[in-house]
Amino acid sequence: MNLFKSKLMNRIAIAKIVGLVFGLLAFIMVPIIFINADIYLRFAILLWYTSIGAFIGVMGIINKHPFLNFSFPFWIRGPFLGGWMNFVLVLFIYDKISFLMQNTAFSGLSPFWLITEGMIVGFVIDLIATKVVGDGKKLIKD
């Protein structure tokens, strides 16, 4: 699939599209799961997952850790980045998520479970972007 001349831009576009799909799913499902969720939270999550897709797309050029010198394949890179980004999200909106989780089946669980969700989403985004476009230095050698 060639949307752009650059392989890196193609990877970023594919990853953003997959992130947008996850964001749209969350946009639809959040009010079903969390009755008190407002429209601002829904749009924030939509844009958040699109941003995670862009971030994972850009980071696809790194398939070897620059400092620790070990392989950084998609099945490590995607979950790490998705989990890290959702960790940051939980730090920003911990109180809001805790409040929303009180009256649901998730009552009593920690909002930090969103990190696991981010790892799964990150894995899927990076898997699809890597299978469709590739990763590593070949992305910048056009």
Regions found by a protein language model. Give the residues of each.
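Juxtamembrane/disordered regions of integral membrane proteins
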Residues: 1-142
